[in-house]
Amino acid sequence: DENPRETFGYALEELGKRQIAFFFTREHLDEGSISSYLKERSGSVPYIANMKLSREDAIDLLETGKAEAVSFGKNYISNPDLYERLVQNAPLNELIFDNMIGTDVAEGYIDYPTLIESVDAKQTVDTLN
């Protein structure tokens, strides 16, 4: 779209008149982002931010009122306990992209370790060494 601010701003205003429950964007938080503009145009419609958010990005968006909620996509695939990891500021598992699309391999979807499993495994290895 040549004029995303105007197009999506207008659409959001019209949707707001119809009392939608929320609006959700998948947009990078960079200089060209229109999320803040859309938030201003949304009136009282709650905004859910998403798109490669770090823990710090999410906290900033929520604490500054730039979003009412945040969501995570890919990080939930590789971190079944993402909420706990974010609360504890713990490291995240890296997503294995090679197994995501077009394979019959379950590996990389359901076998990522939780934080407790990762810590237990590390302690076991450290004990054996």
What does each model-identified segment do?
Residues 1-129:
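Flavin-dependent oxidoreductase catalytic cores
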